[in-house]
């Protein structure tokens, strides 16, 4: 069974900040990448093309917005939670996930096995949060590791406690 690891990048006050080389390294080590439509569009527009060509990228979206016809991009539409359960059950490896909507989908449906939070030492302000979801159950997460990175960021890994 695949493990899904959600990567969250946030400021000290919990606001979203962009992913960096730490995400790139995780994506490279995984069997595939899982992102939402907004993240897909942002990556495509920032790179003027699709940079993640070494492995399959799954994009959770309401419809096909394929800008990368010749690359390894697959769109997850319809019942995304059910499709992701099937992907998770098929084979081994780690799925590296990123994006606010992706995070909410994974956490609201009990699909994330691990959360890696990179906290950047800045205050952003505003009402938007890096991770917003409607958790309404009693899932428990424990700290597996915490490390200060060379650039002053803090990397904390949380693992889900299974009942």
Q: How does the language model describe each region?
A:
Residues 1-163:
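Enzymes that bind and transform nitrogen-containing heteroaromatic metabolites
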